[in-house]
Amino acid sequence: MDHHAMYRTAEFNKTTVRLLAEFIEKTGQNATIVNMDSFLEFFAYLNPTAPIPTVPEIEKQLLLKSPIRCIVCGMETESDSAVTLSIDNASIILTATVIGYCRDPSDAVNQIRKESLRACTKHFNSIFHVIFEGLQIENTYCAHHAKYSLANRWCKVYTMIRSSLGEQFTKFDVRNFKSILQSFLDTFGEIDDDKKDKESSHFDECFEEMDSENVEIKMESPQEEAAEKSKFSENLVEVKLEPIETHELDKTISDFSSSDIIDSSQKLQQNGFPEKVEQMDKYSNKLKDEASDKKYEKPGKKDYVEEEGYWAPITDSEDDEA
């Protein structure tokens, strides 16, 4: 086959793929219809010598024909307000949307499969802050304390998204993602040089489980989580707490008499505290004796005069009479 014949064949196949993709798009069908037996028979009847387009060729044509959309908001992107992302950067952004915006992980997986990974620049500021907003941190000053507690979740979602491509997750991928994620998180909150080594060790701990040739992280579904909780609750032992007994006073303070005090003193003696009781009694008797021995000393007659049973100070008029 000469060069011109090969060119005509390639153009014919290209036109076939384009027309078939338009037909599938307008009819709302899926690209997998090219694998149906009835379609293959119909296509072979029209032109037995023409090659049948494959599903990847149809999907690629559909992507080229459809406008490029942002992987974050899904809106059409413009060349001056959007950037093309690598798989690593796109995975990090999609991971942030899954964790911070409660995005469906399956939707993030579908986005990462696109050939054109573009994102609007207007989302970058919110994407950078979503990790801290999710932890309800007031400012970015203490952000470096929060990133280590969230790094494990990022690793799990990132691994799930990347593994959806069917690629083997190697140590090189772990190191690559680690460097990108650390630079991504270090954008907020300056770390002192004396603390950087210590905090880097905490960051390294988040990747210990990922640092292997084949990393498989199981994402538990809500049903599995509920089953795990019920399994845990079965092992719990129910403990019945008995109410604490409280005793109320039968008498108020005003109801106590001297006889009650004597009775309580006798009980104390019977219970093995005779020495303490005797000391208390001696001290009480001593106070009584001192009070009875004290006599009222009337003031000197020079300054006071006795009037109707009590002593009153002498006034100036009384001094004159005297």
From Swiss-Prot:
Residues 275-304 have a biased composition (Basic and acidic residues). Disruption phenotype: Greatly reduced nuclear accumulation of lin-15a protein but no effect on mRNA levels. Widely expressed throughout embryonic development. Expressed in the six multipotent ventral ectodermal blast cells, P3.p-P8.p, which generate the vulva and in their descendants throughout vulval development. GO terms for biological process: positive regulation of gene expression; protein localization to nucleus; protein stabilization; regulation of translation; vulval development. Residues 264-322 are annotated as: Disordered. Pfam families: Lin-15B. One of its GO terms (cellular component) is nucleus. Required for translation, stability and/or localization of lin-15a. This is Protein lin-56. The lineage of its organism: Eukaryota, Metazoa, Ecdysozoa, Nematoda, Chromadorea.
